[in-house]
From Swiss-Prot:
Species: Rhodopseudomonas palustris (strain BisB18)
Catalytic-site annotation from UniProt: H104, E174
UniProt catalytic activity: D-glyceraldehyde 3-phosphate = dihydroxyacetone phosphate
Protein name per Swiss-Prot or TrEMBL: Triosephosphate isomerase
Quaternary structure and interacting proteins, as annotated: Homodimer.
Cellular component GO terms held in the UniProt record: cytosol
CDD domains: TIM (cd00311)
């Protein structure tokens, strides 16, 4: 991890959580103060909870609003219109979100999202004043075929819009085969891919590319967080299941050097 880049620990709750889950957010906020000097924290609940979570964050006098934020898991590329069931970035911002995940592997697989669509969604996030967390990563078959860097490079080139900065963009590497499986790449594998992403960003964005946060996502848990966070060019984590419990999420954040 680069000492010059403040780490971000982002929790993706996926399709989990009801209003009763505010109790977990309360515990996270209570523990966040101890970690405010260590990392920025972000929780991305389902869209149905974004407003409630943002209101809780705003009302909590013990929270550190500059280091704890609420995000969302997806957005439509258009600001409004006849798109039944979809949610725009503007709506998410209005609900209190400050960031949105785009291009998650589950969206790419379940909904057939292309790099071009992910790019549009990232641009929509910026339009609404949100940080775009752009996800890239290979499947097991692609990894076995030795295509990891080719796949990640192609996704990054196609999904990252022109105009990206360290302020409006985060990149998350999530090897698809590691998500929710309990399996993680070796430290050497993570370092290779994150180094490749960093090089790609600096080639495209010049000096700005050296400042963009690159998160690792894929079965991150308290037991492996410290080792992963110590890897060069790993600037935080995109956490799935382990972010549903305050204790686990805070323990992962505590693993940041």
């Amino acid at each position: 991890m680069s000492a010059a880049i403040r780490p971000l620990i982002a929790g993706n709750w996926k399709m989990n959580g009801l209003r009763a889950s505010l109790s977990e957010l309360k515990l996270m906020l209570e523990g966040a103060g101890k970690l405010s000097a260590t990392a920025d924290l972000l929780i991305c609940p389902p869209a149905t909870l974004v407003a409630a979570f943002a209101q809780k964050l705003a009302a909590d006098t013990g929270s550190r609003s500059n280091s704890f934020a609420i995000g969302a898991q997806d957005c439509h590329p258009r600001a409004s219109g006849a798109h039944t069931g979809d949610i725009s970035a503007e709506m998410l911002a209005d609900a209190g979100a400050s960031a949105v995940i785009v291009g998650h592997s589950e969206r790419r697989a379940d909904h057939g999202e292309s790099d071009a669509l992910v790019r549009e969604k990232a641009e929509a996030a910026w339009r609404a004043g949100l940080v775009a967390i752009i996800c890239v990563g290979e499947t097991q078959g692609q990894r076995d075929a030795g295509q990891t860097l080719d796949v990640v490079g192609t996704q990054l080139a196609g999904s990252l819009p022109d105009g990206a900065t360290a302020a409006n963009t985060v990149v998350a590497y999530e090897p698809v085969w590691a998500i929710g499986t309990g399996r993680t790449p070796t430290v050497a594998d993570v370092e290779q891919v994150h180094g490749f992403i960093r090089k790609s960003l600096t080639q495209r964005m010049s000096g700005e590319g050296s400042k963009v946060r690159i998160l690792y996502g894929g079965s991150v848990k308290p037991s492996n967080a410290q080792e992963l966070m110590a890897v060069a060019d790993v600037n935080g984590a995109l956490v799935g299941g382990a972010s549903l419990k305050a204790g686990d999420f805070l323990a992962i954040a505590a693993g940041c050097p």
